[in-house]
């Protein structure tokens, strides 16, 4: 039996460079959570899209080549697109989509394409995948002054007596 080993690939590898992925390690499962998610000029839209899709394809190819049983892809609630005003919440099966003609949708459309790749690899190679459409990750690399509400709340708590909530309170998650 192969043993389940834990490894943070980001410490040793670059998912955009297939050759940098581990050679002598044995994995039964992969958690693919590598994505640049900041908004703004730090990463051009085409590069953001390519990194999501190409990185996912490399991870899937690696999984097939190394007989990995299952992959967990962290996707994004952004794949649903904007929440229609007529919906109080978005059901998981909702088939909305961000505007594919808007370059600002590169992250969300890239995540949707990554999900589709997982489906194709399941059909072609039998690679089981689970997709988690997450939002609001919190960790040491979270920008405290960007477009992430939780980061802004943490910044305000650390540097002010008041926590500012931007918006009208209508969004529900």
Model-assigned labels for residue ranges:
Residues 30-36, 71-77, 132-134:
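SDR active-site strand-loop-helix element
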Residues 37-40, 82-83, 140:
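Helix N-cap/beta-alpha junction loops of NAD(P)-dependent oxidoreductase domains
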Residues 46-58, 65, 70, 79, ...:
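Catalytic helix-loop patch of NAD(P)-dependent Rossmann-fold dehydrogenases
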Residues 5, 34-35, 63, 114:
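Small-residue (primarily alanine) positions within well-ordered alpha-helices
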Residues 41-42, 95-102, 129-143, 152-173:
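A conserved pocket-lining segment of Rossmann-fold NAD(P)-dependent short-chain dehydrogenase/reductase
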Residues 15-51:
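NAD(P)H-binding glycine-rich loop region in Rossmannoid oxidoreductase-like domains
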Residues 1-9:
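Single conserved hydrophobic/aromatic residue that forms the stacking wall/gate
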């Amino acid at each position: 039996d192969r043993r389940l080993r834990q490894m943070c690939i980001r410490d040793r590898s670059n998912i955009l460079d297939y050759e940098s992925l581990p050679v002598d390690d044995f994995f039964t499962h992969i958690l693919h959570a590598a994505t640049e998610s900041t908004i703004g000029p730090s990463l051009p839209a085409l590069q953001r899209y390519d990194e999501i899709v190409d990185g996912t394809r490399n991870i899937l190819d690696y999984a097939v080549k190394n007989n990995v049983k299952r992959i967990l892809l962290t996707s994004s609630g952004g794949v649903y697109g904007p929440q229609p005003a007529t919906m109080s919440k978005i059901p998981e099966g909702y088939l909305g989509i961000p505007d594919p003609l808007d370059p600002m949708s590169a992250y969300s459309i890239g995540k949707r394409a990554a999900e589709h790749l997982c489906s194709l690899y399941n059909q072609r190679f039998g690679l089981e995948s689970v997709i988690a459409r997450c939002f609001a990750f919190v960790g040491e690399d979270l920008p405290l002054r960007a477009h992430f509400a939780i980061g802004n709340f943490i910044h305000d708590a650390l540097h002010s007596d008041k926590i500012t909530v931007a918006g009208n309170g209508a969004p529900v998650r």
